[in-house]
Every structure is written in C-alpha cells, then in structure tokens.
C-alpha cells in the first residue's frame, strides 16, 4: 500500500509539472507569434513607402497571413488532434521563423531606397534647380528614361513579403487550435479560464515587445550604415521616411525558431489534471480506457469528419458565435491595422512615436484585463453563462463610449493648393489648378513634386519652388529657404523642410484619444475570454478541435483576408496627393484628406460592431436553455468527491449513507 501511495504522489508531481510546463511553452509560442504579427502591423506603413504601393496592396499583404492560415486550418484542427500535437506546434513555429526570414530578404536583394525629391543633398548655387527660377523651362517632370523604368521593377520585391507572410500564416496554424485543445483535454475544466487568460496575456506581452521593436526600427533609417544620414533631407515625421523594417523581421525569425524547441520534448498525451485525487485509482483506470478508445478511433481518422461538420452547422449558438465573431473581427482588424496610419495623419506624429504610444497605453490594460477576468472566474466560480451576460453588458457600454472618438479630432495639415488656399483659407477638396498661384506662376514649378516646406506664416507648401523661394542655405534637414514670394509674414519670408507641426490643442486631443483607447482595451480584454469560453463549451468535447478550426476558418475567410483589402482601398480614395515614380506612375500616398479618412476609419467599424450585437443577443437568449459541458463536468467532479466521502462514512454509520448519497445526487440534478 505504501508503494501505491508513493507511486500516486510521484505521478501527481509529474502530472502537475507537465501541464504547467506545456502551458509555459505554449505561452512562449503565443508571445513569439504575436510578436511577429504585431511587428508586421507596425511596419505596414514602412513597407508601403519602401515599395511605393497603395494601401489596398498593403492590406492584401497583411491579409496574406490569413490566406496561409486558411490553407491548413481545417486540416490541422481536425486531423491534428489525431497526431502528435506538441510536435506539430513545434514544426509550425519553425515555419513561422522561415517566413519572417523570407520577408526580410528584399532589403538585401534590392538597391538603396531612393525617396522622391528634387532637392540636392548639398546646397550650392549650381544645383539649386529645385528653387523658383524665372524664365526657365519646366525640367522637373518625371523621368521617362527606359533604363530607369526597368529599375522600377524592383518595386515588385514586395512579393517576397507577401509570400513570407503566407508562410508565416501556415506556420501559425497549429498553435492555437492544437494548443488550446491540448490544454482543454488535460486540464481541469475550472482551471481552463485561468489558463486561457495566461495564454491571452502571452498574446499581449508579445505585442508589447513587438511595438517597442517596431518603434525602435521605425526610428532608424532603412539604409543605415550604408548611407550618410547627415545628407538626408527627410525626418521620421516625413511621409517619405522608411525605417529599418528588415531588422525586426530577422529578430522575429530567431525568436520563432527558438520557441519551437520545447515542443519536441512533450508527449502526445498527458494524464488528466486532478485525477490523482482518487486514491482508489478508479479515475486512472478510466483514463487508460479513454486512451485505448482514442487509439481505436485513430484507425478511422476520417470517418467522423462529415458528421462532426453537420453537428456543428446545426448548433445555433455556435453558428451565431461565428457570425458575431466575423462582424467584430472585421471592425477590429480595420481599426488596428491602420491605427498607426490614422494617428500619423490625424495628429501629425511619426511612426516611431505612434507605435510607442500604442504599446504604452493600450497593451498594459489588455494584459491586466485578461489576467483579472481569468482569476475572477476561477476564484468566484463564475459560470460561463454569467460571464457571457457580464461580457455583453460591458461590451455594449464600451461601444457607446466609442462614439466619443468622433469629438477628438484635428484638422488637415494646412498645405497650400491641397487643403488650403495660398491665403491660408482651408478648403475641403483639392483642385489641381489651385496648386499654382500668382506668386509662383513664373517659377516653372512641377505640380507633382513632393518636397514639403513649412513657411513662417504657418502654411506648408508642396515644394520650395511652389513657395516661391529663390535662395537656400544649409544642408540636409537643416536647409532653410529664403526670399519666398508666396510666404507673407512679418519675418524674412523663409521656410524650412517638412510639414508644419500641429498645435498644442491637437496634442491634447491625442491624449484624450489614448485615454479612451485605454478604457476600450481594458473592457475588450475582460469580454474576450468569456466569449471564447462560450465557444469552447457550446460544442461537444469530441468536436472541440474541429469547432475551433472551423471558427478560425470562417473568421479568416470573411474577415481576416478581405477586411484590410477593402478598408485599404477605401483609405486610398481619401488620398489628396500621390507620390510619383520615375516613370510617372503613382507611388505611395503622401497626403490624405484627414476628414474623409476619419469618417471611414471611425464610421465603418462602428457600423460593423453595432450589427454584431443582434446575433450576440440571440446567443444570450439561447443560452438560457443550454447546458454547457463544462458545468456538467464540474458537477460530476463534485459528485465524485462526495461519493468518496460517503464511502468513508459507511465504516461508522451504515444507515446514514443512503441519505447522504441521495442528497448529493439531488444537489447535482439541481
């Protein structure tokens, strides 16, 4: 008997360490995959500028991750449970690393980045063709040299990023469905919310690192080390600036490959957490029988696929959850993917500043919310139903607060000929014949060039030539333009490189926007886990992996892939001025109509989120009559523990045992 107790105790320690170690390894994998994903999102603007592509193509590149995920999600979710899940997760992490490495290759295969400019790196009178010079022919038109047009084919290098992101999506496929199902299979049902909360925290810690990495890389010039940055005429706030995006992808590749190592040492199955509490070994015998039954089912690996699909499609709560998720994810992907671009244009910040602010303000409350709701559900034994009702009310409250964002806005950058007249009067639409004015009509300036300068009068101009400037002093970003005929001020009628900065009032509004985002992020994190628990518990245990995979499949097909594409195309329609390539073709957008941009960015997600509350309300109604498997399992566990107590009491009170046993069964039924 002593040997049996010793064996049970040893098994308890081993079981505890394995399930916790797997949770730790999976959390690390979540950190690495979310690090790569968030870094990719922070670098979208840099990729857009590097390859001179419109936002719609950038959205397609971003959505290509979901395409890669889509290729294998159903296969992995169903057949993956029949195979060695930890090893499949490890292989997926390696593939993610290879995808990140491929995404960094264009930097090494293409030449140096040449931003659109007419300004010479040095200031000397013989090269000042970018200034206002009367009685000259217009020589600043896009070059039509065929040799230079061939060089522009290098812009197709973005295909490497596209393919690399697809491969990264393929590698990410097994991590969530197989990892979640592995924990759900071998963890106590009451521990699942806490474990999932820990995993979600890992998904938040990864973005924290990713945003810090993105902010750092965005502040470094893309060709640092190979060019003299003192000769640059652009700063990180310029829409032509490209940060060192490739450095972060190399780091992400290494982190993903390292995260794969622990999974190759985990067994295919683990003992169910908590089974060691039964000293008679009854539950251990049941577990062994369950293992044998699973082995028999593996011989017919495909026979249950169609019945499972039919069962899931006939589950009303599950199907409504998919509809709700599709609408919500459409909204959140659109908002999050283009949040850096929106803050850059709305509040006049650089990519590095914006990315850092997003990380500092948004991610800590999300992390706290994930841990808090997981702890509360475990500590106070809150049922999935109660948590779902609470999540719905909080989410609706946060949705109403969202409309305050419409009041936290700034005006367009005042650019003469684009968003304002040369007298400084703002006008909403761009009219091309207003780019030229009496003050610069004799300068023979190009109307397509984009070398913005800020005048002493607080008004920006598309170029020093269009500002009527006839002289320049200094070099690089310190260059100053003087004798500008279009600048009417009490000073020297001079201008400096770059757009004019927005005032302190706009900076204060940015703080209000970030505070609102903190509240929204915290409430979102609290409502996310109850919603995910409803998804896990509304389907049968044997259908769990397939159900998770099908849910991911639908959200990718109807949200993850199309959302950034159509949203990017809508953003492109708000562009006021496109960059110009050497062959005269349009490049990346340099200036947006921020009023139209704001309407698209805020209104469309609001409409999508608002429509998602209707199916969510039907879910709450259907849940009243639905018995969740997790709640049944919990009651059966209590009944088993009660029966053990009853057996002990039979030794002293034979007549009392039937009454206690019946009471326990009655409580279970209630």
From Swiss-Prot:
Optimum pH is 6.5 with estrone 3-sulfate, taurocholate, prostaglandin E2 and L-thyroxine (T4) as substrates. It is a multi-pass membrane protein. Residues 433-488 form the Kazal-like domain. The chain crosses the membrane at residues 21-40, 60-80, 87-111, 156-184, 204-224, 243-267, 312-333, 354-377, 382-405, 514-536, 546-571, 606-623. It is found in: Cell membrane; Basal cell membrane. PROSITE patterns: KAZAL_2 (PS51465), MFS (PS50850). It holds the Pfam family OATP. Glycans are attached at residues 124, 135, 483, 492. GO terms for molecular function: bile acid transmembrane transporter activity; monocarboxylic acid transmembrane transporter activity; organic anion transmembrane transporter activity; sodium-independent organic anion transmembrane transporter activity; thyroid hormone transmembrane transporter activity. The keyword Iron-sulfur does not apply. InterPro entries: Kazal_dom, Kazal_dom_sf, MFS_dom, MFS_trans_sf, OATP. A conserved histidine residue in the third TMD (His-107) may play an essential role in the pH sensitivity of SLCO1A5/OATP1A5-mediated substrate transport. This is Solute carrier organic anion transporter family member 1A5. It comes from Rattus norvegicus (Rat).
């Amino acid at each position: 008997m002593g040997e049996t107790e010793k064996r049970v105790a040893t098994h308890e320690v081993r079981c505890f360490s394995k399930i916790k170690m797997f949770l730790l390894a999976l959390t690390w994998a979540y950190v690495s995959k979310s690090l790569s994903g968030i870094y990719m999102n922070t670098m979208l603007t840099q990729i857009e500028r590097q390859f001179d592509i419109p936002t719609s193509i950038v959205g397609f590149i971003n959505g290509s991750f979901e395409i890669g995920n889509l290729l294998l999600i159903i296969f992995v979710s169903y057949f993956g449970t029949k195979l060695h899940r930890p090893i499949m997760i490890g292989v997926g992490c390696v593939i993610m690393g290879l995808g990140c490495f491929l995404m960094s290759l264009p930097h090494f295969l293409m030449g140096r980045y040449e931003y659109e400019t007419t300004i010479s790196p040095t200031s000397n009178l013989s090269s000042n063709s970018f200034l206002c010079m009367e009685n000259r022919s217009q020589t600043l038109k896009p070059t039509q040299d065929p040799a230079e047009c061939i060089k522009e084919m290098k812009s197709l290098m973005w295909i490497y990023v596209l393919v690399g992101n697809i491969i990264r999506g393929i590698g990410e496929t097994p991590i969530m469905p197989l990892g979640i199902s592995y924990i759900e299979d071998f963890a106590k049902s009451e521990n699942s919310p806490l474990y999932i909360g820990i995993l979600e925290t890992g998904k938040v810690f990864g973005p924290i690192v990713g945003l810090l990495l993105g902010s750092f890389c965005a502040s470094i010039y893309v060709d640092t080390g190979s060019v003299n940055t003192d000769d640059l005429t652009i700063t990180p706030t310029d829409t032509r600036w490209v940060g060192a995006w490739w450095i972060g992808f190399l780091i992400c590749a290494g982190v993903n490959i390292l995260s794969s190592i622990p999974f190759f040492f985990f067994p295919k199955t683990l003992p169910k957490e908590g089974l060691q509490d039964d000293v008679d070994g009854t539950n251990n015998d049941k577990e062994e029988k369950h293992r044998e039954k699973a082995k028999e089912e593996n011989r017919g690996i495909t026979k249950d696929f169609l019945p499972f699909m039919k069962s899931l499609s006939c589950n009303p709560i599950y199907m409504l959850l998919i509809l709700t998720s599709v609408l919500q994810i459409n909204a959140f992907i659109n908002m999050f993917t283009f949040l850096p671009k929106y803050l850059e244009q709305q509040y006049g910040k650089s990519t590095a500043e914006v990315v850092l602010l997003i990380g500092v303000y948004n991610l800590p409350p999300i992390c706290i919310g994930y841990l808090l709701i997981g702890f509360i559900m475990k500590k106070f034994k809150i049922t999935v139903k109660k948590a779902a009702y609470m999540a719905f009310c909080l989410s609706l409250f946060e949705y109403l607060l969202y409309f305050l964002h419409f009041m936290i806005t700034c005006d367009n950058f005042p650019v003469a000929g684009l968003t304002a007249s040369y007298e400084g009067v703002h006008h909403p639409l761009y009219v091309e014949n207003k780019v030229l004015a009496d003050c610069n009509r004799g300068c023979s300036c190009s109307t397509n060039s984009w070398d913005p300068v800020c005048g002493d009068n607080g008004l920006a101009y598309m170029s020093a030539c269009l500002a009527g400037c006839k002289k320049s002093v200094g070099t690089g970003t310190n260059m100053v333009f003087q004798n500008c005929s279009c600048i009417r001020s009490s000073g020297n009628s001079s201008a400096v490189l770059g757009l004019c900065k927005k005032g302190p009032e706009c900076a204060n509004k940015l703080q209000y926007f970030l505070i609102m985002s903190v509240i929204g992020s915290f409430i979102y994190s609290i409502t996310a886990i109850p919603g995910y628990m409803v998804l896990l518990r509304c389907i049968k245990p044997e259908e769990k992996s397939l159900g998770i995979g099908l849910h991911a499949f639908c959200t990718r097909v109807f949200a993850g892939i199309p959302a950034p594409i159509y949203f990017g195309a809508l953003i492109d329609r708000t562009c006021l001025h496109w960059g110009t390539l050497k062959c005269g073709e349009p490049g990346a957008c340099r200036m947006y109509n921020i009023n139209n941009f704001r309407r698209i960015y805020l209104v469309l997600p609001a409409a999508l989120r608002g429509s998602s509350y209707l199916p969510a309300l039907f879910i709450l109604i259907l849940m009243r009559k639905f018995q969740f498997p997790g709640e049944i399992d919990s009651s059966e566990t209590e009944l088993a523990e009660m029966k053990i107590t009853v057996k002990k009491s039979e030794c002293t009170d034979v007549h009392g045992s039937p009454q206690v046993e019946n009471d326990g069964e009655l409580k279970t039924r209630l």
